Amino acid sequence: MARVIHTGDTHLGYQQYHAPQRRQDFLDAFDAVITDAIDEGVDAVVHAGDLYHDRQPGLRDILDTIALLRPLQDADIPFLAVVGNHEGTRDAQWLDLFETLGLAERLDDSPRVVADTAFYGLDYVPQSKRDDHDYTVADHDADHAALVSHGLFTPFPYANWDLDAVLADATVEFDAVLLGDNHTPDTAQLGDTWVTYCGSTERASASERDPRGYNIVSFSSDATTDVAISRKSLNTREFVFVDADLGPTDGTAFIQERLRERALDDAVVVVTITGDGDTVTPAEIERFGDDRGALLTRVNDRREFDTGDDAPDVDVSFADPDDAVEQRVRDLGLDEPARDVDRIVRDDTLADAAVRERVIQRAEAVLDDDADAADDDGRPTTVEEFQ
């Protein structure tokens, strides 16, 4: 029998809300997964993509990852992973670096057998390339088979990738498909195949209200079930969600009273305003929450404001602008060069004066089909540059 931890969407390096503490929180959550794997003696840790939040993680993020994966190596627990959409590069992947160090294995179309189960990997594939993608995989002689992949698959919400078609085109029958990308954990069954999302290990957006965690997946030849999927929650940073539905005369004082009713110490506080009421200044609410011990406070005003007879309805949100932009960019279905430009413009580590030059470099590299120049930003992007 094979028993593995199925995790993903760890988003290491994400300095959410521009808070260094949140960057550490994402690392701590991944650390907790690794610790559980060793304590429980699982057969493998299977990561379904988006180990990193960005395709250019900082050196500190790389070193922290190495430090966390070494105990797994010492415990003889393999770390099996695929590449997600956030971290994918044009050339060698970060997983390739860890593989050369003996710390990870990048799953592909060849079986990686753990106990009695063969694991295969399917990296994130952009929508424009899926119709031409070859889903042929090598055969195996294990008792069970599982596919690990990253993307928004049917039959789950927000899907744009037909899993039925993938399974039909695959040359191996899978007992389970272990997925990443959707941060909401969920499980379904397509015919005889179990399909499951593990969810994220930390809250990457204010919409992720449920506890974070990972899956434990067991493969056996039991007469009742071949695949068993269970959940394990992680002890992550406390998020306090305050939903304030304002009446006609309510305003800042009403929201402050709601905050007084809650324990805010060291928490990320997310205030969502709906209803009617007076004008509320987000900065005033944020200062109030922070003064009461919150790590940080964000206000999300969902009310509609009419600024004139012919003015359109406006939905104003202050909760997580970076997350909102990322989601909008993703919804637009932009190709990789366009997503590169978006990341450059929003990179708060890049001086404003350098943005124009960096965008021009990217554009010229794409036009010349020069992938090396496209990644020429001074950071190592291949295994060879690390050696």
Swiss-Prot record:
Its EC number is 3.1.-.-. The keyword Transmembrane helix does not apply. Nuclease activity is regulated by Rad50. Disruption phenotype: Mutants show a slight growth defect, but do not show increased sensitivity to ionizing radiation or alkylating agents. Show decreased rates of survival after UV-C irradiation. Display extensive delay in the repair of DNA double-strand breaks. Keywords: DNA damage, DNA repair, Endonuclease, Exonuclease, Hydrolase, Manganese, Metal-binding, Nuclease. Part of the Rad50/Mre11 complex, which is involved in the early steps of DNA double-strand break (DSB) repair. Mre11 binds to DSB ends and has both double-stranded 3'-5' exonuclease activity and single-stranded endonuclease activity. Residues 366-375 have a biased composition (Acidic residues). Belongs to the MRE11/RAD32 family. This is DNA double-strand break repair protein Mre11. One of its GO terms (biological process) is DNA repair. CDD domains: MPP_Mre11_N.
